[in-house]
Amino acid sequence: MKIKKMTGFAAAIMMCSAFMAGCTSKTSAATKGNQACDTIKIGVNMELSGAAGGYGQQEKNGIQLAVDEINTKGGVNVNGKKKKIKAIYRDNKSSTSTSASVATQLTTQDKVVATIGPATTNDGTATIPTANKTCVPFLSASATAPDFTLDKNGKVHPYVFRAYFKGDYQGSSAAKFAYETLKAKRAAILADNSSDYGIGIAKAFKQYFKGTVVDTQYFQAGDKNFNSVLTSIKSKKFDVLYVPAYYTECGTIIKQAREAGIKQPIMGADGMSDDKMVKISGAENATDIYYTTAFTVLTANSNPKVASYNKAYKDKYGEDSPTFAALSYDSVYMIKQAIETEKSADSVKIQQGLAKIKNFKGVTGDTTMDAKHNPKKAITIVKLENGKPSKGYVVK
């Protein structure tokens, strides 16, 4: 007798069948995953403190705004019955080990039917085994590593999704923009080599930049003195400095680069999309700065949803919406659409609904989920002048 080897996807489905929890259901989905009762519980496994706390707080704001909006309108339509959403927030403290334990708590104790977060690739990766084991999908609003949704053999993790484009798309788009719009022929790269985020985006920029990369330097997250490496870079003839990293180091690098007399444009990725970066760099140094992102209020004319969303966000939180809040806001509505498409709030059905998302109309643009659970969507580039967003470019 021949024994067929089970695929990763099928194995995950079988594995999680023993973890059924929640309300009784007559659907086949009741044999696995978690089921919603009168309230749809969505877990939020988020970096609310620690190194990535700035991103996590943004995402919490976006999630709560979406939940409040949906509940005010009566809730989610689950096969003709309206059910309200309850967001259950857990702080993973920007720690991979805590992210993993929070994932277990949310799925096995809180009995959530879907999870949003973690925000970062490393923390999100730590939760993947739990998602596949318990059949509770998680949607990261901002993880960017190219292979985030895939296992080591290139197979799709069935219960892992993201609402943000891959990091290599940021790198390639930045390379194109630098060459075609900024007219840069020579680029220098200063990247964070302590995370998949920085390494992956830097690699893509280097691969797709049509000019010459004259220098590539690396640093570790937590470094505070970049004067030596910036002096070395300054000695090279370059037209743009590319810095794919998180806001803490980006802010310090911008400050020290300008103080060292580097006047060329500085580009980065979505890690720059936090007001804390400008507080670190100083507004006077944050001019001719560009970064790739999924959202900016500056492109409201190209998306009718942006203006009304930003007004609601500003009314609630007293400021314009940042990128990660918009991404997490869309994430809640993507889960809502998945539930309404499948006419079920069972976790397995939500997974199926997320995989089917097509032409989702969000504040971060139109989104279609591809076969590898990555979204297809346009990218935006923001320009900072004196620390303030001054212009937005939509790159398709």
Place the predicted regions along the sequence by residue.
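Segments of small-molecule ligand-sensing domains
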Residues: D315-P322, K336-P389
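Short, low-complexity disordered leader/linker segments with a strong preference
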Residues: M1-K41, T72, V395-K396
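Hydrophobic alpha-helical segments within soluble ligand-binding/sensing domains
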Residues: S99, R162-A187, I199-I201, N225-N227, ...
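Short, polar/charged alpha-helical segment
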Residues: Y55-V78, K203-Y208
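Extracytoplasmic ligand/sensor domains, especially the bilobed periplasmic-binding protein
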Residues: V112-D215, K263-Y290
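Extracytoplasmic "Venus flytrap"
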Residues: N34-Q64, R90-T96, A119-N122, L190-I199, ...
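Extracellular/periplasmic periplasmic-binding protein-like sensory domains
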Residues: I254-Y329, P389-K396
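Beta-alpha junction/loop-to-helix N-cap segments that form part of ligand/metal-binding clefts
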Residues: S28-K32, G54-Q58, V76-D151, F219-K224
